[in-house]
Amino acid sequence: MRGRLQGVELIARDWIGLMVEVVESPNHSEVGIKGEVVDETQNTLKIMTEKGLKVVAKRGRTFRVWYKGKIMRIKGDLINFRPEDRIKRGLMMLKRAKGVWI
Amino acid sequence: MLRRDKKRESRIARERVFYLIKRAEEWKNIDYELARRYVELARKIAMRYRVRIPRELKATYCKKCLYPYKAGKFRVRVRKSRVIITCLNCGFERRIPIRPKRVNRKV
């Protein structure tokens, strides 16, 4: 599939402050965690839900993200970098992928 | 060869830095520790992508311990023609000189 990729910004952008829901996870009790991201590390997102702060690993999970009025699904493996590395390494990773235009 | 798009990177980095410092400002009364983390992240991004943080934003947090200044946690005094901002968390003093307006001597 060729063409401009949607939501490239989201990989380089700040996730702090976004609404996020865990859609897929190898751990069943994590599915359905929904809330605002308050902090981020290399391997985890810290999500503030109604029941309190939850720490969810990025690898192997799929997230649903509300961003600029759109809803997107993003694989956690794509953002598995340190938050400050994500701009450089995230964009380069997409460039290396075959058939992706950014 | 694949090249980095540095213009794009620095544009995104600038957005993120400003956003994080603004957010730290909003959160400092809710969660002080988290607000500090936002400043720390903002500075990390700014240093890596060489984004300059403007002076008015730099003056919103302590340079040493990175806690944002909030009411009751900092002191501002004018001494010896300097503004002296003291952080009451770590005691670090930041001195900002006040320069008198330049007078044109030739006139």
Swiss-Prot record, chain A:
InterPro entries, sorted: RNase_P/MRP_Rpp29-subunit, RNase_P/MRP_Rpp29_sf, RNP1, Rof/RNase_P-like, Rpp29/RNP1
Protein name (Swiss-Prot/TrEMBL): Ribonuclease P protein component 1
Known EC number: 3.1.26.5
Any Pfam family: RNase_P-MRP_p29
Family (UniProt): Belongs to the eukaryotic/archaeal RNase P protein component 1 family.
GO cellular component: cytoplasm; ribonuclease MRP complex; ribonuclease P complex
UniProt KW tRNA processing keyword: yes
Assembly: Consists of a catalytic RNA component and at least 4-5 protein subunits.
GO biological process, any: rRNA processing
Localization per record: Cytoplasm
Keywords: Cytoplasm, Endonuclease, Hydrolase, Nuclease, tRNA processing
Organism domain of life: Archaea
Function description: Part of ribonuclease P, a protein complex that generates mature tRNA molecules by cleaving their 5'-ends.
Catalysed reactions listed for this entry: Endonucleolytic cleavage of RNA, removing 5'-extranucleotides from tRNA precursor
A GO MF label: ribonuclease P activity
HAMAP family: RNase_P_1
Curated annotation (Swiss-Prot), chain B:
UniProt binding sites for Zn(2+): C62, C65, C87, C90
EC category name: hydrolase
Compartment list: Cytoplasm
Enzyme Commission code: 3.1.26.5
Gene3D superfamilies associated with the record: 6.20.50.20, Immunoglobulin FC, subunit C (1.20.5.420)
GO CC terms in record: cytoplasm; ribonuclease P complex
InterPro entries noted in UniProt: RNP4, Rpr2/Snm1/Rpp21
Primary localization: cytoplasm
Catalysed reactions, semicolon-separated: Endonucleolytic cleavage of RNA, removing 5'-extranucleotides from tRNA precursor
Entry's cofactor comment: Binds 1 zinc ion per subunit.
Keyword Phosphoprotein applies: no
Keyword annotations of the record: Cytoplasm, Endonuclease, Hydrolase, Metal-binding, Nuclease, tRNA processing, Zinc
Role this protein plays: Part of ribonuclease P, a protein complex that generates mature tRNA molecules by cleaving their 5'-ends.
Protein name: Ribonuclease P protein component 4
Encoding gene (name): rnp4
